[in-house]
Amino acid sequence: MDFLKEIVKEIGDDYTKLARDIDDTEKYVDTGSYIFNGLVSGSIFGGVSGNKITAIAGESSTGKTFFSLAVVKNFLDANPDGYCLYFDTEAAVNKSLIASRGIDLERLVVVNVVTIEEFRTKALKAVDIYLKKPEDERRPCMFVLDSLGMLSTEKEITDALNDKQVRDMTKSQLVKGAFRMLTLKLGQANIPMIVTNHTYDVIGAYVPTKEMGGGSGLKYAASTIIYLSKKKEKDGTTVVGNLIKAKTAKSRLSKENKDVTVRLYYDERGLDRYYGLLELGEIGGLWKNVAGRYEIDGKKVYAKQILKEPDSYFTPEVMEKLDEIAKEEFSYGS
C-alpha cells in the first residue's frame, strides 16, 4: 500500500487517486422531465450525466434544438450562478428564440462554429480556462453542440473554394480526435455536454435501422445516446409542441433499448415535467387505466385533468413510489 501511495505521489496529479479515494457520487442535470430523467439515469430525480457527454440524435425537425434548449433552461434555473456555452453550427439560435424559451440571456454564450477543427479548438480552450480557475471559483457550466452533423472540415472548405470535386475522407477521424481530447477534459472539469446529431436510415439492413452521422467518434465518447422520433401535439387545431419518443441506443447509467414518450412545448414551458408518469405508474401497478380514465384514490380521472393539476395527484409519497418503479424499469441490475 505504501508503494502505491508513493507511485500516486510521484507520477500523479489532482486526478490520480487510489480507487478507494475516488468520489463515486454521480451528479445529474435535471432535464425538466421526470420520465426522461428516469430513462437516462434510472431515477425520476436524476437526469443526464453531470460530467459526461449525452448525444441526442434524430431526423430533421424532431425537436433536437428545442429539446437541448429545454435542458439548458432547466440547468440555468437550477444553478442561478451557472452558465452555458452553446456551440451553434446552423445559425439556428438567435436572441428571440432563446428569450422565447425563458432562458437568461446574460448567462448563455452562443459560439458559431463552422468546422470540426474550430469547434475542437474553442471547446478545449474554454475547458482549459475553466480548469485553471481555483475549484471554489468555478461556477456550474454546461456545453451544447448543435449539431455535430452540420460541422464541415477545413479540407472540405478548401476543396470547395478550389472547385475540387473530391470526397472528404478526413471528417470521421477529426470527430474521433476532437472527442478523444474533450471527453476526459469535460469529466475532470465536471462539465456536462449535450451533442445533437442527425440520423439516417442504414441501407441494406435486415431490419429498419437508424445510424448517427459523423462516424463512430461520438458513439464511443458519449455516455448516453438517445434517439428521438416525434408526432405533433395539438391544442384544438393549433400545433403547440411535439410528443417525442425517446429511446436509449446506448447508456452507461440505465438500461439500453428502453423508450418513453415526453411532451415538448414550443414556448417557455419546454419539457412537460409530469408527462409520462401516468404510464409509468400504470406499469408499476400504482393505478389502472380504465376506458381512458385513471383510477386514483377511488376516483376515475382523465389524464388531461391530472396533468392540469399535477401537484394534487403527484404527491411526495406518490413520487417516491414512482421513483422505485423507475429504478425497477430503467436501472441496470433490476
Whereabouts are the PLM-identified features?
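Peripheral, non-AAA+ core regions of ATP-driven protein-machinery
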Residues: 18-24, 35, 164, 239-242, ...
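Residue-level preference for the first positions of well-ordered beta-strands
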Residues: 53-55, 83, 140-144, 192
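Catalytic P-loop NTPase motifs of RecA-like helicase/translocase cores
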Residues: 93, 151-152, 202-203
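A short alpha->loop->secondary-structure connector
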Residues: 101-108, 159-168, 210-215
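Phosphate-binding/switch loop-helix module in NTP-utilizing enzymes
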Residues: 114-190
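The Walker A/P-loop phosphate-binding site
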Residues: 2-107, 119, 124-128
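Phosphate-binding/switch region of NTP-binding enzymes
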Residues: 168-284
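Terminal-proximal interaction/regulatory segments of ATP-powered molecular machines
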Residues: 289-334
